[in-house]
């Protein structure tokens, strides 16, 4: 069994050694330009076209929760990956726990009005504010996949009213489910906090725009943990300036790194983190990949395979 590995920023040597230990029967090598030797599996992130083109692979593993970079490259270069080759993403591997920490901490930050108190502190102003009430602080999750379900579970502990929206209806205990475009307006109408965990597909690009924001309650909050392309940044800035959106926590952006001239940097109602809400945990990823390869070698049916037509 031959495995090729490519990631532009990861510690390649660590990964190769960890994979060799986890899959002793495998010959693991770092892929370099010009390497056309045979391979059974490819572990990749933003791979060059030549790495995968023409190979008879058993599977490709994307080293992250999203596969949009691979799928977008496939649109431009269909020859990069044969249609018969399964594509897998890292469904969790510790990312669910990180998303839970990030989402819960920020929801509580807004619920306890720490954002308002920070603004008061900046002007040396002492003024206790009325508290928010849980029953009026409905949290809506856009995107009800693996990470969305994890976030919903963690927020249930705090007894907030919860709802989710996705392409198909979900049966999550304690979470009101909405499905399809025809139910999006009803979903949005009660969301004091909107958490975006949608996949990046042609249908979801620009979905958080002026039209969507107008359907939220006045003074809603936005937490974007998915992809920057989901948000029309000018529309969000206008909503923040008008008070329609009271605050935004943004981990992802249309351009990354976020350009210094972006107005988001200086907005008093925006908090920015540099795409760190959930990062790949190498040890857990290696364990998942080695287990999945073992199952593939046995011919077992697996979860986590990407539907290329849907984009996730």
From Swiss-Prot:
Keywords: Cytoplasm, NAD, NADP, Oxidoreductase. The active site is at 227, 275 (proton donor). PROSITE patterns: D_2_HYDROXYACID_DH_3. InterPro entries: D-isomer_DH_CS, D-isomer_DH_NAD-bd, GhrA_Enterobacterales, NAD(P)-bd_dom_sf. Its main location: cytoplasm. It catalyses: glycolate + NADP(+) = glyoxylate + NADPH + H(+); (R)-glycerate + NAD(+) = 3-hydroxypyruvate + NADH + H(+); (R)-glycerate + NADP(+) = 3-hydroxypyruvate + NADPH + H(+). Gene3D superfamilies: NAD(P)-binding Rossmann-like Domain. Catalyzes the NADPH-dependent reduction of glyoxylate and hydroxypyruvate into glycolate and glycerate, respectively. This is Glyoxylate/hydroxypyruvate reductase A. It comes from Escherichia coli O6:H1 (strain CFT073 / ATCC 700928 / UPEC).
């Amino acid at each position: 069994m031959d495995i090729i590995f490519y990631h532009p920023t990861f510690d390649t040597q660590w990964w190769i050694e960890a994979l060799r230990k986890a899959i002793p029967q495998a010959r693991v090598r770092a892929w370099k330009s010009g390497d056309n030797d045979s391979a059974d599996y490819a572990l990749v992130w933003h791979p060059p076209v030549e790495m995968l083109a023409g190979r008879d692979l058993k599977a490709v593993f994307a080293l992250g929760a999203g596969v949009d970079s691979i799928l977008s490259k496939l649109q431009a270069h269909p020859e990069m990956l044969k249609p018969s080759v399964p594509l897998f993403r890292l469904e969790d591997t510790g990312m669910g726990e990180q998303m839970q920490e990030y989402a819960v901490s920020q929801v509580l930050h807004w619920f306890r009005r720490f954002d308002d108190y920070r603004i008061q502190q900046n002007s040396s102003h002492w003024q206790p504010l009325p508290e928010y009430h849980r029953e009026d602080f409905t949290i809506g999750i856009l995107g009800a996949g693996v990470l969305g379900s994890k976030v919903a579970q963690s927020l249930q502990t705090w007894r907030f009213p919860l709802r989710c929206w996705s392409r198909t209806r979900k049966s999550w205990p304690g979470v009101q489910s909405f499905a399809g475009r025809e139910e999006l307006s009803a979903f949005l109408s009660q969301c004091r906090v909107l958490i975006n965990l949608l996949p990046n597909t042609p249908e979801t690009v620009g979905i958080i725009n002026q039209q969507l924001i107008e359907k939220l309650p006045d003074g809603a909050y936005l937490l974007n943990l998915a992809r920057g392309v989901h948000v029309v940044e000018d529309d969000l800035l206008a909503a923040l300036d008008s008070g329609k959106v009271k605050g935004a926590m943004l981990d992802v952006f249309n351009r990354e790194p976020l350009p210094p001239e972006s107005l988001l940097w200086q907005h008093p109602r925006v908090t920015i983190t540099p795409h760190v809400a959930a990062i790949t945990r190498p040890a857990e990823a290696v364990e998942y990949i080695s287990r999945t390869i073992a199952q593939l070698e046995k011919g077992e049916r697996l979860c986590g395979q990407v539907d290329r037509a849907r984009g996730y």
